[in-house]
């Protein structure tokens, strides 16, 4: 560490790296469930006026199956196709100002729209963390369908004998074991806007 940063800073970076890994693992396990959900819960194609009825039906089906409020989640780019379905000719000035100031609507036909934070994959600014083509239709207030399990405690091993490494540095290794699973009896929907 050469006294360039404190041990507390190192631990904070380790925690941030583990957190990023867990978030990416959860997202990847959820995104791979799409095709296994069945045609009632997984749709593909552009969201336009022609597919509006199918989109509305998917939202309704998730709400009925979960007996709860539903939200539509996606990145700003993914939600843009839903924004385009909102007609503002009849809207109040407050709604028009919301679109003008934020570039988006907070609701689509009474359904809350939730923007997922986007980011780049580690060391690659050409790959996004979250697909810009995927919308998630998720129930609110039900038990989470994604389960995260840690096995045991996170362990840290240190080599603090300056003679062990040729350059006389110390080394540390952090180990944690976890698993992620998606329970598919909780109904949710996915819409892939890739054409």
Predicted regions and their residues:
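Sequence/fold signature of self-assembling virion shell proteins
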Residues: 88-195
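Short loop/turn segments at secondary-structure transitions that flank enzyme active sites
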Residues: 20, 24, 78-80, 178
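A broad, structure-centric signal for solvent-exposed, well-ordered loop/edge residues
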Residues: 33, 79-80, 120, 181
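Extended amphipathic alpha-helical segments with heptad-repeat/coiled-coil character used for oligomerization
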Residues: 42-95
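Alpha-helical scaffold segments that mediate packing/assembly in large oligomeric complexes
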Residues: 1-65
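Generic serine detector
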Residues: 6, 29, 66-68, 80-81, ...
